Amino acid sequence: MSIISTKYLLQDAQANGYAVPAFNIHNAETIQAILEVCSEMRSPVILAGTPGTFKHIALEEIYALCSAYSTTYNMPLALHLDHHESLDDIRRKVHAGVRSAMIDGSHFPFDENVKLVKSVVDFCHSQDCSVEAELGRLGGVEDDMSVDAESAFLTDPQEAKRFVELTGVDSLAVAIGTAHGLYSKTPKIDFQRLAEIREVVDVPLVLHGASDVPDEFVRRTIELGVTKVNVATELKIAFAGAVKAWFAENPQGNDPRYYMRVGMDAMKEVVRNKINVCGSANRISA
């Protein structure tokens, strides 16, 4: 088995009306927990790492882990660069083997965003690497960056059409009312806006900020054309909460084989639920 481009996964999802879950990873345990469930449920998966992830553990180490686990679990997977902001950083990581990258220029004006994304697309497509970009801007906290509500804005459908045409991007992350992190109240998702974007944009659409969004809302976005669903915060909360509870019950405990497994098992339940919500189970042949 191998690490592949997300475009092959997303093309199948778009053709068959489901979404591929993209789970953020941080170390060997998070990769293993996610793939244990994906292997069992035969779900395609995208493992995503932010620049902050690769400050914690080198890309080359993450890549080696993903390659090994792909063989262990006999399934293809995509390793994805999430929320990267420079061509130089992406270029280095693509040369190291990655075949999926998100270039995030959403904080730039439209024309600057287009210019940056187009430069990344031109390079990545020469390396069989798919490219995701974002138009519109989500609020909340992602990695080390915080975007307040006043700076967030939703994706304009006609701008989305122009953006895809000008850049040649493979998938588009849209801002329709979700945010990174948790919500203080139920998010207001602009389903009509999503439907209008889907009418004029042919490439796969991506939902960022799916943690803590009601399952029925996520399912509705998939019905309207979302083919990649990003999940990060819920995984971390489940893992950390279970480990904290274990230490509360075992204050003298010190063996990572036990407390890490508790965290992994809690994370696995989140993964299992998201696969069911995305409708991605049994999409990989045995």
UniProtKB/Swiss-Prot annotation:
Top-level EC class as recorded in UniProt: lyase
Name a GO molecular-function annotation. tagatose-bisphosphate aldolase activity
**Cofactor binding, note field:** Binds 1 zinc ion per subunit.
For activity, the cofactor(s) needed are:
Zn(2+)
Q: What is its EC number?
A: 4.1.2.40
Which PROSITE patterns does this chain map to? Answer: ALDOLASE_CLASS_II_1 (PS00602), ALDOLASE_CLASS_II_2 (PS00806)
Could you name the domain of life of the organism this protein comes from?
Answer: Bacteria
Q: Any one Gene Ontology biological process term?
A: carbohydrate metabolic process
Q: Which InterPro entries match?
A: Aldolase_TIM (IPR013785), Class_II_FBP_aldolase (IPR050246), FBA_II (IPR000771), TagBP_ald_KbaY (IPR023788), TagBP_ald_KbaY/GatY (IPR011288)
Query: Which sites bind Zn(2+)?
Result: H83, H180, H208
Would the keyword Isomerase turn up in this protein's UniProt record?
no
* Keyword terms: Lyase, Metal-binding, Zinc
Q: Which GO terms describe its cellular component?
A: cytosol
Q: In which pathway does it act?
A: Carbohydrate metabolism; D-tagatose 6-phosphate degradation; D-glyceraldehyde 3-phosphate and glycerone phosphate from D-tagatose 6-phosphate: step 2/2
Which reactions are catalysed by this chain?
Answer: D-tagatofuranose 1,6-bisphosphate = D-glyceraldehyde 3-phosphate + dihydroxyacetone phosphate
Q: Active-site positions, per UniProt?
A: D82
The entry marks the following residues as binding dihydroxyacetone phosphate, namely G181, G209, A210, S211, N230, V231, A232, T233
What protein family is recorded? Belongs to the class II fructose-bisphosphate aldolase family. TagBP aldolase KbaY subfamily.
Query: Whom does it interact with, and what assembly results?
Result: Homotetramer. Forms a complex with KbaZ.
What does the record give as the function of this protein? Catalytic subunit of the tagatose-1,6-bisphosphate aldolase KbaYZ, which catalyzes the reversible aldol condensation of dihydroxyacetone phosphate (DHAP or glycerone-phosphate) with glyceraldehyde 3-phosphate (G3P) to produce tagatose 1,6-bisphosphate (TBP). Requires KbaZ subunit for full activity and stability.
Q: What is the name attached to this protein's record?
A: D-tagatose-1,6-bisphosphate aldolase subunit KbaY
Give the gene symbol. Answer: kbaY
